[in-house]
Amino acid sequence: MHPLRCVLQVQRLSAPFTSMCWVLLRTCRAQSSVSSTPCPSPEAKSSEAQKDFSSRLATGPTFQHFLRSASVPQEKPSSPEVEDPPPYLSGDELLGRQRKVYLETYGCQMNVNDTEIAWSILQKSGYLRTSNLQEADVILLVTCSIREKAEQTIWNRLHQLKVLKTKRPRSRVPLRIGILGCMAERLKGEILNREKMVDLLAGPDAYRDLPRLLAVVESGQQAANVLLSLDETYADIMPVQTSPSATSAFVSIMRGCDNMCSYCIVPFTRGRERSRPVASILDEVRKLSEQGLKEVTLLGQNVNSFRDNSEVQFNNAGSANLSRGFTTNYKPKQGGLRFSHLLDQVSRIDPEMRIRFTSPHPKDFPDEVLQLIRERHNICKQIHLPAQSGSSRVLDAMRRGYSREAYVALVHHVRETIPGVSLSSDFITGFCGETEDDHRQTVSLLREVQYNTGFLFAYSMRQKTRAYHRLKDDVPEEVKLRRLEELITVFREEASKANKTSVGCSQLVLVEGFSKRSTTDLCGRNDANLKVIFPDAEVEDITNPGLKVRAQPGDYVLVKITSASSQTLKGHILCRTTMKDSLTYCTT
């Protein structure tokens, strides 16, 4: 008997509740001498399949069905779902068993916030936190990749920790070292291959996975999760406030960035933009208010492009308005609750809580945002406008979406709309192809705008960026450093002039504590986010005439400014007050 010969025929079908799928149909042909039921012909099978498809299509959901489903708000679970542990790990293995974790943070304020998110997750799994490196069982470094210098700092730190790990007494549990954040995302392969003493890698979107990763590490393996997410915002995780005397807090409202500036690694290490639901942000701010905190900073890589699309009824709204003369590198986004709505709602929670936000993009300052900042007394009159360069040619190479002229026009518009506003900015010197004339234009922008605060850096090329693939890092390092020094000098001169306009004025200051340089001076920050130093003294409480008090962290006080530098104001305290009452007395 000849063996059976099988022929596989692939036919594409459609099921009513799924997308198109591939189905394998087995048809068999046997030798005519073999006694078997004959298979239908291909034509018959095709006709039968078409009839079956038509029947299922007629009884399946219609377009109206999907419209009705979309218009009905989905019931939200009372608590976030907790995924079952992988089958090879028991629930007990995911517990920290009171092992001590030491967390070390590098880079931006988002990393500081991420550190508290990671700690909140580990705390719930039974880990303890320690500030003593020597007693730690797990050391986690929350890292930054924005510049080469930041990464080199981490490599140097790992060499130091390697000594600590090799000298670990055998009587103690093995020391585990993990790299978290942007550097884990950018250099995952190099870290695991170059530094065998690193046990764990977790990218910015993988902190929920830390208990599992640590459990895998305990089995003697390296563990890594650096997957980027399109929707992870950690909205359900309340960061742990580790300082009991803290007067302010940062609230992350969105993650990632879609701007794709040619020099920037952020979209590749933190992924696409996604925003937290407004309701979860408001809930976190309310809790911080109840804890007595007096200042909240809304945080995001591109904070003012916030767009909450979680509520269906707001998804059909039009696209956002951009600052005049500004463009985007992406298609305009439609719908959602925008930053102006969030800022409005947050500022209404507690009239005695100051509201800030960082870091914005200049393109996302429509008039409704500026008007709101002007009208609300508890939204700080301080705006960060990252320029990056004063040369339109360089700005075009950076893919910033604006010219020098458009940027300067925005500065004038902001100052006209918000009298007395304080401005800060970011600048990069030595970008690809930057000439001496380009550099002089940046110097002239610093003099023209006269920022109160500035953050200036020499360009550091990052792999994966558009500049890495399409431009040449052709400005010598010594030239970059020389230009940076020139920018810093000019910035300090102009900032000192700008800040000296406050001398003689009375300003509202939120007390943070004693000055680091003197136990007799107090330190706080004004509306412009400038540090204000003033002698500790007994003063009157304006809300309770006749009562003499000494200012404490978290108090609002009026301070008369007597001197100013490029970074600090000095003065003497007048009284303790509230935000509302201070409106009568502040002269700036």
Curated annotation (Swiss-Prot):
It is found in: Mitochondrion. Its EC number is 2.8.4.3. It catalyses: N(6)-dimethylallyladenosine(37) in tRNA + (sulfur carrier)-SH + AH2 + 2 S-adenosyl-L-methionine = 2-methylsulfanyl-N(6)-dimethylallyladenosine(37) in tRNA + (sulfur carrier)-H + 5'-deoxyadenosine + L-methionine + A + S-adenosyl-L-homocysteine + 2 H(+). Expressed in brain, liver, skeletal muscle and heart. Gene3D superfamilies: Methylthiotransferase, N-terminal domain (3.40.50.12160), tm_1862 like domain (3.80.30.20). InterPro entries: Elp3/MiaA/NifB-like_rSAM, Methylthiotransferase, Methylthiotransferase_CS, Methylthiotransferase_N, Methylthiotransferase_N_sf, MiaB_methiolase, rSAM, rSAM_horseshoe. GO terms for cellular component: cytosol; mitochondrial matrix; mitochondrion; nucleoplasm. Residues 500-575 form the TRAM domain. Residues 33-53, 70-91 are annotated as: Disordered. [4Fe-4S] cluster 1 binds at C108, C144, C182. It holds the Pfam family UPF0004. Residues 1-30 form a transit peptide. One of its GO terms (molecular function) is N6-isopentenyladenosine methylthiotransferase activity. Residues 243-498 form the Radical SAM core domain. Keywords: 4Fe-4S, Iron, Iron-sulfur, Metal-binding, Mitochondrion, S-adenosyl-L-methionine, Transferase, Transit peptide, tRNA processing. Residues 99-219 form the MTTase N-terminal domain. Disruption phenotype: Knockout mice show a deficiency in ms(2)i(6)A modification, resulting in impaired mitochondrial protein synthesis, which leads to respiratory defects. GO terms for biological process: mitochondrial tRNA modification; negative regulation of cyclin-dependent protein serine/threonine kinase activity; positive regulation of mitochondrial translation; positive regulation of translational fidelity; regulation of cyclin-dependent protein serine/threonine kinase activity. Binds 2 [4Fe-4S] clusters. One cluster is coordinated with 3 cysteines and an exchangeable S-adenosyl-L-methionine. Its cofactor is [4Fe-4S] cluster. [4Fe-4S] cluster 2 binds at C257, C261, C264. Belongs to the methylthiotransferase family. MiaB subfamily. Interacts with CDK5R1 (p35 form). CDK5RAP1, CDK5RAP2 and CDK5RAP3 show competitive binding to CDK5R1. Probably forms a complex with CDK5R1 and CDK5. Methylthiotransferase that catalyzes the conversion of N6-(dimethylallyl)adenosine (i(6)A) to 2-methylthio-N6-(dimethylallyl)adenosine (ms(2)i(6)A) at position 37 (adjacent to the 3'-end of the anticodon) of four mitochondrial DNA-encoded tRNAs (Ser(UCN), Phe, Tyr and Trp). Essential for efficient and highly accurate protein translation by the ribosome. Specifically inhibits CDK5 activation by CDK5R1. Essential for efficient mitochondrial protein synthesis and respiratory chain. This is Mitochondrial tRNA methylthiotransferase CDK5RAP1. It comes from Mus musculus. The lineage of its organism: Eukaryota, Metazoa, Chordata, Craniata, Vertebrata.
